[in-house]
Amino acid sequence: VHVTSRILTTAFAAGLLATGVAACGSSDDSGSSTGSASSGGGSSVTATLNGAGSTFAAPIYQQVGADLKDKGLTINYQGVGSGAGVSQFAAGTVDFAGSDPALADEDKAAIKKGEAVQIPFALGAITASYNLSGVKSGLKLDGETLANIYLGKVKSWDDAAIKAQNPDVQLPSTKITVVHRSDSSGTTKGFTQFLANYSPAWKSGPGVDKDIKWPTGTGAKGNDGVAAAVKQTDGAIGYVEQAYALQNGFTFADVKNKAGKYVAPTLESTSAAADGIEVPADLGVSTIDAPGDGAYPIVSQTFAITYKDGCKAGLDKNKVTGLKTFFNYLINDGQDTIKKLSYAPIPDSLKAKDQQAVDAMQCNGAAIGS
C-alpha cells in the first residue's frame, strides 16, 4: 500500500490499509458487475478505480475507499496535487481526477477522450496555520496582511499590521517563515484568489493560479508537506486544509471575511460559505470569499472528475459502473464520512444538481445501472 498523505490520524490510518492507495495507471482489471442496487445509488460492481489529484481531498478518498471495499470497489488514489491529477486524467492514465478548483477552459480542452463531468462533493477550510511559541489559536489576520506576509513585506510577528489587529496579544519579535506549496495545487489557487481579492499588489504580481512564482518563502509538496514544514519551524506560517491542521494540533488564524468579521475555520463557518451558492451549468462552483457574517472566507470546494460517457472514452462497462457507484456514494452516504474527517458536506441545493449529473453518466449512450 502506497500511502499518499504522510501525516495521518489513527482514525483513518486503519482505513488506509483497506483502501489500497497505490501509484498506478488506468487499469482494465475491472471485474464484473452484479447489477444489484448499492447504497447511495448506482449498481453493485467489482472494479478497480485509479485516480490522482488533490491532496486537500486525499483523506476523503482514502476513507471512502475503505468504506466501499466491501461493495467490491478498490480505489487507488495518488495525492499528487490538483494540477498533476487533471493532467494525468487528460492523458488517460487514471480513471478519475480530484481537483479543488473547477476545470478551467484549457483543462476541458486538454481532455480529448470525451466530455468530462465534475462533481463538487465537499467543502474544506484553507487555514492560515502558524507555529508561534506562546501564541494560541485565534490570532486575527485580514487578507491584506496575509498577502503582505506572503509578499515578504511583513517579516516579523510583532509587525504593526499584526499588532493593530491583535492589541491584546503579546506578540514575539520572531521572524516569520513563509511556507507555500511547491507543486501545482488547487489549495494554492484558492489561497491566492483570496489574497488577490484584498491586495492589488498580489493581484498584479504573483497572481492567481495553481502554481505561481512565489516572492518569498520555502516550498513543500502537498498539504502534508506544508504541514510538516510548519510543524518543524517556530515562527512559520502555511496554508493547509483544516483536516491536516487538526491532525497536527496546529494553531490557526481567525481570518477577516467579506462582511468584516474575523471568523475561525470550523465546520459551521465552512458550511456557511456555501449558503446561497450560485451553481453554474457545469457545476464549477467557487466558495472563496463568500458573503455572510458567519462564513469563513478561505473555503475551497473539491471535485471528483471523470467522463460523462466513460465507455466512449475507452473504459469498460464494469469500470464505468464502478465510477457511477463511487460518485453516488460521495454525494450521498459518503457525506457522513466527509463530516467525520472535518470537511463540510455540500448543501442540498448543490447535491440535487450533483445527483442529476451522476444519474446522467452513460456507457455508449445508454444509462448505467437502470
Locate predicted features:
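Non-catalytic, conformational "gating/processing" segments within enzyme and secreted inhibitor domains
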Residues: 167-194
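C-terminal motif of bacterial Sec signal peptides marking the signal peptidase cleavage site
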Residues: 19-23
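Periplasmic-binding protein-like
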Residues: 119-130, 254-306
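Extracellular/periplasmic juxtamembrane helices and adjacent flexible linkers that interface
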Residues: 2, 41-43, 169-174, 289-370
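N-terminal segment of the mature folded domain
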Residues: 29, 35-163, 170-171, 227-229, ...
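Ligand-binding pocket segment of bilobal, Venus flytrap-like solute-binding proteins
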Residues: 86, 184-276
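Bacterial N-terminal signal peptides that target proteins for export
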Residues: 1-11
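Short helix-loop capping/hinge motifs at secondary-structure junctions, enriched
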Residues: 133-139, 156, 184-187, 201-202, ...
